[in-house]
Every structure is written in structure tokens, then in C-alpha cells.
Amino acid sequence: MVSLFDKLNAKKDGRDGSVSKELLSHSVAHTKNRLPKSGRRTSERSLAASVKDGSCSNSKSNKRNSSASVSGEEDKSCLISLNCLCCGVPLRFPASITKFRCSACQVTVIVKEPEINSNLESSTHISCTLEGLQMVVRRCHDDLQRLKKTGILDKERKGLIFQPVITYLLDRFHDVSILNRSFLVHDGGKNIKMLNYEVLQRFYSILSNLPTRKPYYSMLCCCNDLLKRITINKGENLQILQYRWLLIILNIPTIRTCLIRDRKSKNVFETQQIRAVSYELAKRCIGYLSNLSTKTSQQLIQSLRRTPTDNFSYQVEILNLYINFQFSRLLSNELSNRTAKNNVKPEDEMRSRLRRHHTTGHEFLSTRPISAQSNDKQGSGFTHPVNNKMKFKFFQYEEDWHIHSAAKLTFIYYVANTRRNGRGALSIQSFYNITLDFIDYKQDFDHWRGVAQKTKMNQLIEEWGNSTTKKCFSFCKYPFILSLGIKISIMEYEIRRIMEHEAEQAFLISLDKGKSVDVYFKIKVRRDVISHDSLRCIKEHQGDLLKSLRIEFVNEPGIDAGGLRKEWFFLLTKSLFNPMNGLFIYIKESSRSWFAIDPPNFDKSKGKNSQLELYYLFGVVMGLAIFNSTILDLQFPKALYKKLCSEPLSFEDYSELFPETSRNLIKMLNYTEDNFEDVFSLTFETTYRNNNWILNDSKSSKEYVTVELCENGRNVPITQSNKHEFVMKWVEFYLEKSIEPQYNKFVSGFKRVFAECNSIKLFNSEELERLVCGDEEQTKFDFKSLRSVTKYVGGFSDDSRAVCWFWEIIESWDYPLQKKLLQFVTASDRIPATGISTIPFKISLLGSHDSDDLPLAHTCFNEICLWNYSSKKKLELKLLWAINESEGYGFR
């Protein structure tokens, strides 16, 4: 048998002057990084009918299993309607067609009869393995070393030496079934086949470190042919039923790098051809995965929720980079037209805009440092238009199937992430895409809200003709991609419109009835009975809740431009959480508050309570705080916000609220000995401390109350078989059943405020908590960021002596003092959810001379007023007096 090494030596000796050129058996149809034209001539292998929006063209194939030609007299009743498996575009074609091509994404679909006797044992055992590749590569390296010793090594011979690697890859990557059997590992005995991502990464790493690019490029081209010509069985409802092969292709390393334009990269595997083919793989993998059937999508979700965190995060990042890439193309085209006259390169203009964006205090809009920030460093070609005129309009992406498919697939990953309990779930920030901060969110939101409120007539018009129609797209349908900053902007936009509408209606009513109708929702309260006065005003003005809020404190000067409103929220929540009210209990072990199980004077049989209306008041207050962009000082667990967002609760939520009890429950669950009942001796009951007994020390009530968790629970012992059910009912009792009347009253007040506000649906529980409570800092505030956005009034500047002293003093203070200062200036010791750099902070000069007076604060405008004090020590002393001895509007 003649080896490859002998053949190469034979060429040197002149015995065999021919060198095989069959290095690639598969070719890529499109190697330029652009969309293929719909009218482009197909290759001989993909002659098919081009189908789009119900139009078909007759074609013939030169293959043995040729597609049936379509007669122009085909009965229209035999037409099949479906969405493209890759791009989702609606298609209609005759049932007799066995091969068709979508002219939008250029994918050819071959429909074949299912194989009845498919017992091809020789092929069912073939799979792509790391060991197989290592063996082939090792032999090729041995041949390479021997060839180096002969001194006849050149580029062409080096490529021929690694021809066995190319053959191995083409044999494995040409078939979907082979790829689906490759790189598998079983997950914990649950009979779920998972991809072994560690092995897969090592597999690609070997290919990336070969001395030639040809094997890697051959694999890419083979994958591209596989994705461009998909074969499905007739009995599968024309759907893709397998997904693992798509994940294998999606994890090819150059798919990520092709979405980042790094012009300084010296990697030999980042050539233009490799980047172009890698992009083709990216867009079709994302397209196929986003259009899987419901059943297959559920299987994909089950697989993703068990995927290692690093690999899961990597795939989410690819989706965000892909969206960035699509918007960069939109922006590049626009900037090319704008900069042509000025002879400025679009890439330079975009990078300039990106640098300006990252120096204007808007870093909070995205917390994804990898995909968002690395793009700038590596020259991704995308920048963010800081000019309001430079917004992505809705029509630019409304019909873009690339963006649609990426958003749909990101939704699948988001759902999988919510189910990754104990498996390293990503935070919501990992799904944020900073690019979307620069869409025209008003158009997008109006379109989304318009679709949600579409009339029956419009629906009938769309369905006329009984044709397959595409669903309307809007990024508001995928809110997890939108950053918290743009969601807040959307909410402020809707709230502003609602308030303007309410004010307009009040004005029209006043004209119609000839009497004065207030355009504001005014609340007049006394500090000592703030809860009673607030509840009375809210009850008397139920129809005014959506108007702009104005607060007035009795016998106190002050016009509410925002500061009085903050003060009212702060004092009212403090009053509602007063332990003597008995509305909420404070749990020391978790430092969290929760609804009291037995509020004072609560009659369970009638569901009435003299103080139950205060829960309604608290719900209204929380809603008004969001509605009026005010932060509340609350210490609720995540369970409350999950309940508000209709998200399922878990044992982890109970653990956050009652950590000590949850540890004991876990110990019970982990106990597996046979003497379980003798050791624990428990029944389906729970005992809690009576809140009324704590408040009133009443002899008529018991200190502890025992409740059955199920029917006849006192006689149902806890065993090894039902201990999980016991824990489930225990958690359900404390988080739901025991507080149901109180919570229902609270949520009715909350929903009363947001009855007409759709934007609240954009927030999940994590974001809602930040929206209500702000961004909680653990140790110190970032006053350097605040200083960078501070404005100076009255003669002060950033380098003024008193100003420099001020910043030095507050940065040296401990956290409690910093909170007091923030409370003094802004009427809240919390910073906004979007970060401290978004506070419109001001420092103004009261007088150019020294003074013994204390500093002043205008909480309506987040402004502190300083005298030009003579020394740093004096300034610090005056600040301490001001923040510790002030309350209300006037010193006491």
C-alpha cells in the first residue's frame, strides 16, 4: 500500500508528476459577507422551484430523484402553506413539489418519503469524535515531520498531507444524523442526551491549531452546504425535529469572531473567506433554531437549562453580537450616504460616535461587558447615535428576518434561563443589548400597543384570503433584550402621555360644566397622621390617580416641584411599616419584611379588617411611586416582585425570607435513613407566632397558632415518601395561602394605578425591584461618577476650593453618612435603578464670602447650596449639622 508520504517522494523523483486537486468536495455558494440576491442563479445541485409568498416557478433537476415539474393547471386546493424553516417567510407551494427554495434566505428544502426499512447499521455507528480526529491528525503530523526531514516541504504538499483530516471532516459533517450522534453525554441518568461542550471545544481547538487552514475551511463549507439544503420527511409536518447538530455548528469559534470586525487580528483563521462562510453558518443556524416546532423547542429548552453556564452565556452572547451586526449594517448604509460628501469613512464616524456615547454617563444602559464593550475595542463597526435624530426607525427592522430570528431564539434562551434553578442562571443584564437603546422606542412601543389593542375588523382584514401571514414584530414583544434604561424611557413616555390626556380631559370637563377641575392629583396631609390623611385623599379621588401628583404638608411652606413628593413617599412608607400597625412583620434572620399572617382585628371568616384598607393604600403608594419616578426604601424579598409579575415561586424564595427554617427543611430532605419518622416525628402542621399577641399582649389570644397544611393534617405523619410534598405545602402556606387576603388587597391597589399602563408588562421581577427600590449599594456610593455629571451654578466650578473640599469630605465618609447626605439633597437615600450617574445633581454658590449659616438643599432639583466656607473643617462641620438635624421644610 502506497502511503501519502511515498506519493510526495515520488513527485520529487519525477515518478508521479500529478498532484491531486480534490481537496474540497463541497463548495460554498456565497463567500461574500452580504445577503444573497433572490434572483441569483442556483448551482446544478440546487435546481429547484423558487417559492415565496405563494409564487412558484417550474424547474427540473438533473438528479435521479428529481423534483416533479409543476403544471400551470395545478389544483389550487392542493397548495401547502407554511413558514420557511430558516427565515420564517410565508410560503405556498403545490403538494406535489418535492423540492423548493425560499428566495428570501436561499435555503433549499427537499421533501422525501420516510424510509420504512432504515436499518443501515453501518452508518448508524458512525459519529464524529475527538479521539477519531486526534488519531487522524497524529498520523498527518507524523507524515509532516518525515517530510520536513526530506527538505521538500512547501505549501501545496503541506495541504496534501492533511487531506485525511479533510476527508474525515467531510464524511462526518455532511449528514445531520451523524452530527446528532456526535459529542454526546448523558445528563445525570435522566436519559437526556446532552452535548459535551468541553470535548466539542477541544475538537475545534485542534482544527484551529493545524498548520493549514484547509481542513477548517472544508468543514465550514460542508456545514454551509448542509444548512443550505435541508432534507425533511413528509410525515414530520415539514418541521425540523433535531437540533443538536445546529448547536454543534453554532459553537464553531469563527462564528463569534466573524461578528466582530477586528482589523488588528493576526489570526490566520480569520480570513475574508472564513469570515464570510462563518456568517452564513451563523444566520442559518439562528434561523433554523428560531423556527423549530413547539415540541422540538421544548426539547431544546430542556437541553439548554442543563448546559454549563459558560457555554450557555457564550451562546447568548453570540445572539447579541448577531443583532449588533445586523444593526451595524443598517447604520453603515446610512452613514455611508451621510459622510460621502465630507470624505469621512463610515467606520471612523461610527467609532467616534461610540466613544462619545461611552463618555456621557450612559454606561448603565448595558451591563454586558463582553459583547457590548469588546465591540468598541475590536472595531465592530457599530456605534450608537447619541444624536436624537440618529435613531433606528421601526421600518428599518420591521421586515428584517435576521433580527426577527435572533430575537425569537433569544426568547428560547431566556425561557431556559428562568428554569436553570441551581444551575447558574444568568442575570437579566446578560440578555440586554445596548444597540437597542437607539431604536425609536416610541414607534416600537406604539406599534406593539397598537397590535395588542387591534380591533376585530383589522384582524378580519388581515385574515382575508385565508393566507399564511407573518406575525407583527416589535422589540417590546421581547422585553428581556431591552435594557432597563430604555424600558424606563418607554414607561416615562407612556406615563407622560397618560398624564397629558388626564389633564386635557380635566380641562375639557371644566369648560363643559363651567366649574374648576384640578389637572393635578393633590394630596394634603399632616405629618402626625400621614397614613390616615393619605388613605382618605386616595379614596376620595380614585379617578385622579393617573394625574400628576402634587403634595402639600399642612402648615408648612413649600411648592411641590418634586421634593415634597419624595418626602411624602418616604414618610408614608415609614408609617405603614411601623411595627405598631401590625401590617408587616420584620424577620431578623433575613432582614426582610413580609405580610403579617394575622393583621390586627382581622376576621378570617368574613375576610374583613379595620386596617385591611391600609394594604390597598400601600399598593397604591407603590404604584404611584413608580408612576412618579420615586424610589422607595423597602426591604421585601424577591418573592413579592415575582408575585406581582406572575412568576412562579420556588424554595429559593422561601430561603431568602426564612433562611434558618429553610436550612432545617433541607436537612430533613437530605435525611435518608429508615428511622425517619422516629427521628423527626412530624405531621402536616405548622406553627407560627401570633402577631396580635405580640402587639397587644392580650390574654385572650394565644402566643402561637398551629395550622394544618392539608385536610386532617394533624393525623398525617411525614415519611420518606411524602416529605417533599410537606415542604411544598409548607412553602405554599407562608408565601401564598396565609397572606392571600392581605396580598389581594395590596395588588388591587397596585393594579388600580397601572390599569391603563401597558409598559409595566415590560419589566420582570428583578427589574421591578430595581425600579421600586433603586440600585442598592453595599458599601459606598460611587461619587466619582456623580461628580462627572454634576452641574455648578452661581459661580462654582469643578475646581473651586469649596467644591473640591465637598467631594473630598463625602468620599471619606462612611456609608451611613453618605446615605444621610443623599437623603438630605435628593429626599431619598437610594440611587436610581439606572445608576448614580443619572441623578441630575447640582451644587450652587450661596455667597462668595464666608458664613456661619448651614448649607441648604432643594430636593425638588437635587441641589445643594454651599457658602464659600473658609476652611475644609468648617465645611464638614456644617454639612454634618445639616444632614443630622434637618427634617421637613424648615429646621427644627
Curated annotation (Swiss-Prot):
Catalysed reaction, written as an equation: S-ubiquitinyl-[E2 ubiquitin-conjugating enzyme]-L-cysteine + [acceptor protein]-L-lysine = [E2 ubiquitin-conjugating enzyme]-L-cysteine + N(6)-ubiquitinyl-[acceptor protein]-L-lysine
Q: Where is the composition biased (Low complexity)?
A: 55-70
Sequence ranges of Basic residues compositional bias: 31-40
Any single GO CC term annotated in Swiss-Prot or TrEMBL for this entry: TRAMP complex
Protein's UniProt keywords contain ATP-binding: no
Q: Which domain of life is it from?
A: Eukaryota
Q: Does the keyword Transferase apply?
A: yes
The GO terms describing molecular function are:
ubiquitin protein ligase activity; ubiquitin-protein transferase activity
Q: Which residues form the active site?
A: C860 (glycyl thioester intermediate)
EC number(s) of the enzyme?
2.3.2.26
Residue span(s) of domain HECT: 792-892
The GO biological-process annotations, alphabetized, read as: protein polyubiquitination; protein ubiquitination; RNA fragment catabolic process
Q: Where in the cell is it found?
A: Nucleus
Q: What class of enzyme is it?
A: transferase
Q: What does this protein do?
A: Probable E3 ubiquitin-protein ligase, component of the TRAMP (TRF4) complex which has a poly(A) RNA polymerase activity and is involved in a post-transcriptional quality control mechanism limiting inappropriate expression of genetic information. Polyadenylation is required for the degradative activity of the exosome on several of its nuclear RNA substrates.
Check the record and name the PANTHER family matching this protein: HECT-TYPE E3 UBIQUITIN TRANSFERASE, UBIQUITIN-PROTEIN LIGASE E3C
Q: What does the subunit comment say?
A: Component of the TRAMP complex (also called TRF4 complex) composed of at least HUL4, MTR4, PAP2/TRF4 and either AIR1 or AIR2.
Instruction: Please state what the protein is called.
Output: Probable E3 ubiquitin-protein ligase HUL4
> From which source organism is this entry?
Saccharomyces cerevisiae (strain ATCC 204508 / S288c)
